[in-house]
Amino acid sequence: MSRRHAAEKREVLPDPKFGNIVVTKFMNSVMYAGKKSVAERIVYGALDLIEAKTKQPPLGVFEQALDNVMPAIEVRSRRVGGATYQVPVEVRSTRRQALGIRWLITAARGRNEKTMTERLSAELLDASNNRGNAVKKREDVHKMAEANRAFSHYRW
């Protein structure tokens, strides 16, 4: 382990439109090369598209999508006597959120729609209905943890 002190948690301000900290974190993850205004346009555009398609509050759909994507357990490598075991461990809440956001954005970037706004809105809608690549990623992680349940006594 590192002997240095843990990095300080940075304060994340709520976004201007919804007043939600999670939306800001999502926006920051979408952002490339410090272009926050572009990321803002993409995220708000996607949420507006969702509202137009579903006639539901977009924040509710967004939170549902994120809940459906966040993993509860994952596997971590642990070396024991020359063998490396994949040990299932619970995911702490901050990491759950970070992974969920990351998987949603990665899945959206891999889609075939024309603009990033359309891709993101489609992936969020899919994830809120328990479909899509981001949900598949979560299922794969859970399946991997379930398959390696025999090694759970190696947890630390």
Swiss-Prot record:
GO molecular function of the protein, one example?
structural constituent of ribosome
Q: Does the keyword RNA-binding apply?
A: yes
Gene Ontology cellular-component terms for this entry are: small ribosomal subunit
Provide a GO biological process annotation. translation
Keyword Nucleotide-binding included in the entry's annotation = no
* Xref: InterPro entries: Ribosomal_uS7 (IPR000235), Ribosomal_uS7_bac/org-type (IPR005717), Ribosomal_uS7_CS (IPR020606), Ribosomal_uS7_dom (IPR023798), Ribosomal_uS7_dom_sf (IPR036823)
Keyword tags: Ribonucleoprotein, Ribosomal protein, RNA-binding, rRNA-binding, tRNA-binding
UniProt xrefs under SUPFAM superfamilies: Ribosomal protein S7 (SSF47973)
- Give the UniProt family note: Belongs to the universal ribosomal protein uS7 family.
Function as written in the Swiss-Prot or TrEMBL entry: One of the primary rRNA binding proteins, it binds directly to 16S rRNA where it nucleates assembly of the head domain of the 30S subunit. Is located at the subunit interface close to the decoding center, probably blocks exit of the E-site tRNA.
Q: How does it assemble?
A: Part of the 30S ribosomal subunit. Contacts proteins S9 and S11.
Q: What PANTHER family does UniProt report for this protein, alphabetically? A: RIBOSOMAL PROTEIN S7
> What's this protein's name?
Small ribosomal subunit protein uS7
Q: Which organism is it from?
A: Rhodopseudomonas palustris (strain BisB5)
User: What gene does this protein come from?
Assistant: rpsG
